């Protein structure tokens, strides 16, 4: 049984590592895959697993951007350290809306929106949004091409967009990237800020899920720990590859292809839901 669950955890780790950073919804994909590849574990554990596995993914950002995000780096001068602290303060400002709403409505969202149909609809809705916005911005020069120019007001607006991602299928990265692009950020700035915003958000969400899992009287057996660690490690490795791919892809391309992917996948899934 452990072996069967391990290979399923590896598959989920691969999916998490790819979909966390591409604007196609990692949680949504994990919920969808769970319809077809079920781990032989409790529902409480799987709800927690689908969020906590993101810790592996977020560590990829920490490693890849360690120098840029580390305000204590001896290789930075005083001005560079100050800029790093300012960046972190903007990230924390952007976290506020989702932190407040998420804490208040987390259980409600889990009960009413963590399902196949919701994910399918959200994939289509935000896929269309990406297609329309990229078409609109095709010949429009971005106003903000450097993270230093990303204001606190802009950070708060992007944080408000992140609230939308509390509904599965939306995509945290997708919602925040869309929000940043709509207020004039370049695709690269929008993507990097979305990466950094994910660090406190995903750490917070993961620890909240672990706390609620334990508060229900659940415990971690050796099998659960092995599965959780395996999925997280796989997510970390795959995330490194996915992040590098996306940043390189955006040098010459936009997000339209991801919009079409979302629309097509969502339509297929709704068809499956209607006729299965």
Curated annotation (Swiss-Prot):
Location(s) in or outside the cell: Cell membrane
GO molecular function: undecaprenyl-diphosphatase activity
EC numbers on record: 3.6.1.27
Topological relation to the membrane, as annotated: Multi-pass membrane protein
Listed InterPro entries: UppP
Keywords associated with the record: Antibiotic resistance, Cell membrane, Cell shape, Cell wall biogenesis/degradation, Hydrolase, Membrane, Peptidoglycan synthesis, Transmembrane, Transmembrane helix
Transmembrane segments: 45-65, 85-105, 113-133, 150-170, 188-208, 225-245, 255-275
Pfam families recorded: BacA
Domain of life: Bacteria
Main EC class the enzyme belongs to: hydrolase
Any single GO BP term: cell wall organization
Cellular component terms (Gene Ontology): plasma membrane
Annotated catalysed reactions: di-trans,octa-cis-undecaprenyl diphosphate + H2O = di-trans,octa-cis-undecaprenyl phosphate + phosphate + H(+)
PANTHER family reported for this sequence: UNDECAPRENYL-DIPHOSPHATASE
Family that this chain belongs to: Belongs to the UppP family.
Stated role: Catalyzes the dephosphorylation of undecaprenyl diphosphate (UPP). Confers resistance to bacitracin.
Miscellaneous: Bacitracin is thought to be involved in the inhibition of peptidoglycan synthesis by sequestering undecaprenyl diphosphate, thereby reducing the pool of lipid carrier available.
UniProt-recorded name of the protein: Undecaprenyl-diphosphatase
Annotated organism of origin: Enterococcus faecalis (strain ATCC 700802 / V583)
């Amino acid at each position: 049984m452990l072996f069967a669950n391990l290979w399923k955890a590896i598959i989920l780790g691969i999916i998490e590592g790819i979909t966390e950073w591409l604007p196609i919804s990692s949680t949504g994909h994990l919920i969808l895959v769970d319809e077809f590849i079920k781990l032989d574990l409790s529902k409480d554990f799987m709800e927690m697993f689908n969020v906590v596995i993101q810790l592996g993914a977020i560590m990829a950002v920490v490693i890849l951007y360690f120098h840029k995000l580390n305000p204590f780096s001896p290789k930075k001068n005083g001005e560079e350290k100050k800029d790093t602290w300012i960046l972190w303060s903007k990230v924390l400002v952007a976290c506020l809306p989702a932190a407040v709403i998420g804490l208040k409505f987390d259980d409600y969202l889990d009960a009413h929106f963590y399902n196949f149909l919701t994910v399918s609809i959200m994939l289509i809705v935000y896929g269309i949004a990406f297609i329309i916005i990229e078409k609109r911005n095709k010949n429009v020069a971005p106003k903000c091409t450097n993270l230093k120019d990303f204001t606190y007001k802009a950070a708060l607006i992007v944080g408000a967009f992140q609230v939308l991602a509390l509904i599965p299928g939306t995509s945290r990265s997708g919602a925040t990237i869309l929000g940043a692009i709509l207020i004039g950020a370049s695709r690269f700035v929008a993507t990097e800020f979305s990466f950094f915003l994910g660090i406190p958000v995903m750490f917070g969400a993961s620890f909240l899920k672990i706390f609620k899992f334990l508060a229900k009287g659940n415990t971690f057996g050796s099998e659960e720990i092995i599965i959780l660690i395996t999925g997280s490690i796989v997510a970390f490795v795959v995330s490194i590859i996915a992040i590098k791919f996306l940043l390189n892809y955006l040098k010459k391309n936009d997000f339209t292809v991801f919009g079409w992917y979302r629309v097509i996948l969502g339509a297929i899934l709704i068809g499956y839901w209607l006729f299965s």
